[in-house]
Amino acid sequence: MQDFPTAPAQAALFLDFDGTLVEIAERPDAVVVPPDLPSLLERLSAHLGGALAIVSGRPLLELDHFLPVAIAKAGNHGAVLRPLPDGPVEQPALASPPAAWRAKAGAFAEAFPGAFIEDKAHGFVLHFRQAPEAGPEAGMLLTSLVSEAPDDFALMPAHMAWEVTPRSVSKGTAVAYLMSRSPFAGRVPVFIGDDVTDEAGMAVAREAGGLGLRLQDSFGTPGRFRDWLAVLEGQLARGVAA
Ligand SMILES: O=P(O)(O)OC[C@H]1O[C@H](O[C@H]2O[C@H](CO)[C@@H](O)[C@H](O)[C@H]2O)[C@H](O)[C@@H](O)[C@@H]1O
């Protein structure tokens, strides 16, 4: 078992989705969620008094689609949160990138068969997994566009994708906000993720005395990570992990 900085029963778990809980797929809609994963996460959340949250770049509705269980979720890299499993959705007021940026990115993607844009509420992703030759040029285009409003927007490298996001939110702000309120407050944060976009969440967890774990280093693969979660759930259920 991965060592915790405290008794596991006192931890607050923050889990990335793509590349951590599920394997990366060719397209965002093609990820395969193991049938037993949602209920495993729901049981883990219950053992932790609700202090388990999915913290993802995905929109909240997609997280609800892939993980249709009552657990806390933060989507769009911290731009939308549901801190309590069945509670209300919370969204800070955020600007959207200029329409001209989206139009230029869309025209760029159209020139590379396989590349496409994924729209989000306050940003967009330019995916190039099926057009890898587009990656560097896409990065240069979006770097140039974001430089027009660097205080408001950030460009994040993701797995075979570039994402334009509001600068004021991140997985770090999501973890900090959740840790400020029940049932997360007072627990020791443990963030597990696989990507550059997870580093802000890991950093906040570490600064709070917890753990920021990179999946590849600590677990290897999403499958092995899911196995670890199942073992942890069993221990918490039997009361032998505290
Ligand atoms: O924060 P995450 O839960 O890791 O989500 C990050 C982004 O994941 C998705 O894109 C990535 O996963 C796809 C499915 O495996 C893959 O096809 C793509 O190449 C990856 O970049 C999702 O589409 C984004 O919205 C998330 O921000």
Model-derived regions: residue spans:
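Non-catalytic pre-domain segments flanking phosphatase-related domains
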Residues: 1-17, 21-26, 36, 179-180, ...
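Substrate-recognition "cap/lid" segment bordering the active-site pocket of phosphatases
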Residues: 76, 83-104, 156-186
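Mg2+-dependent phosphoryl-transfer enzymes with acidic/Ser/Thr/Gly-rich catalytic loops
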Residues: 8, 167, 172-242
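Charged, glycine-interspersed solvent-exposed loop segments at helix/strand-loop junctions
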Residues: 115-132, 153-165
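Conserved Rossmann-like nucleotide-cofactor binding loop
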Residues: 20, 60, 197
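Substrate-recognition/cap helix-loop segment adjacent to the acidic, metal-dependent catalytic center
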Residues: 58-76, 134-154
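Active-site phosphate-binding/coordination module
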Residues: 32-120
